[in-house]
Design a protein with these regions (language model features):
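Glycine/tyrosine- and acidic-biased, solvent-exposed loop/turn segments at the edges of beta-strands
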Residues: 1-117
Length: 117
């Protein structure tokens, strides 16, 4: 990322609605197909955060602004993906390595971790 005025690198952030997955030939493919993630209109695979925002309800802002956060490096999902309930309590946490999920944790709306059977 280019440095900001104070010389630090600023991380890119976008919304999923502005992202697309492309195959090796540059064709847009489905979400589950093989390919790299790009911000629409960009030539290079995306590096940065992708966030989902909770929408206002009944004209009031949401209690918690985000419903998920994902991290991408050179078009591949990496790091921790976190999903939240509208209250701000954690709903799910997925850990990615090279685009593959390597671990997952889930919580109920009260914040209790759900155990796998």
């Amino acid at each position: 990322q280019p440095p900001t005025e104070n010389g630090e690198n600023e991380e890119a952030v976008t919304k999923m609605m502005y992202m697309e997955r492309r195959d090796a030939d540059g064709n847009i493919v489905g979400l589950l197909d093989e390919g790299l993630w790009f911000k629409q209109g960009d030539e290079a695979p995306y590096t940065g955060l992708v966030v989902g925002m909770n929408k206002p309800k009944d004209g009031k802002p949401p209690e918690f602004p985000y419903n998920y956060k994902r991290e991408f490096q050179d078009g591949v999902q990496v790091g921790v993906e976190t999903g939240w309930y509208t209250t701000g309590k954690k709903r799910i946490e997925l850990v990615y390595e090279n685009g593959e999920v390597v671990s997952m944790r889930q919580w109920d709306a009260d914040g209790n971790e759900l155990k796998e059977d």
